Amino acid sequence: MDIDPYKEFGASVELLSFLPSDFFPSVRDLLDTSAALYREALESPEHCSPHHTALRQAILCWGELMTLATWVGNNLQDPASRDQVVNYVNTNMGLKIRQLLWFHISCLTFGRQTVLEYLVSFGVWIRTPPPYRPPNAPILSTLPETTVVRRRDRGRSPRRRTPSPRRRRSQSPRRRRSQSRESQC
């Protein structure tokens, strides 16, 4: 059975595979970040969002994996076999957990659409031959500045330059709408 944990979020394992393994912070850093930013929502009995649920599951999964690794470390007598198991867990399972944690923390922090646009942008950048691409890779934290403009225009007709003669202009300055985030529980 081929299960893609990102499918319901509009991404895929393949899309995340464009990011190099050293791109993702350590599991410890990601766990600390999720606790610092989302502890209340993660510990709440309330359902907040699918990203909170997936993040909870990834954290629980990592805890179980560490319990198993500790058991193996304490019960496997052959040092070579023990090292093989530890290396496999750190290399393969560790990377998968780091990807999952990063994806869901990023979606909660920046918004799912921004993260998906970043993954596509990075994928295009990394596959473009070096002589033809900009020297620096896209940066996730700078994407909202450029994507907000595109989002605002979707589904709307172009704004008129002159006010309609039937409507009077308000004397109060226009308030800028704050962008709602998926991360609010």
Curated annotation (Swiss-Prot):
Residues 179-185 are annotated as: RNA binding. A motif (Bipartite nuclear localization signal) lies at residues 160-177. The modification Phosphoserine is found at residues 157, 164, 172. Residues 157-179 are annotated as: 3 X 8 AA repeats of S-P-R-R-R-[PR]-S-Q. Self assembles to form an icosahedral capsid. Most capsids appear to be large particles with an icosahedral symmetry of T=4 and consist of 240 copies of capsid protein, though a fraction forms smaller T=3 particles consisting of 180 capsid proteins. Entering capsids are transported along microtubules to the nucleus. Phosphorylation of the capsid is thought to induce exposure of nuclear localization signal in the C-terminal portion of the capsid protein that allows binding to the nuclear pore complex via the importin (karyopherin-) alpha and beta. Belongs to the orthohepadnavirus core antigen family. This is Capsid protein.
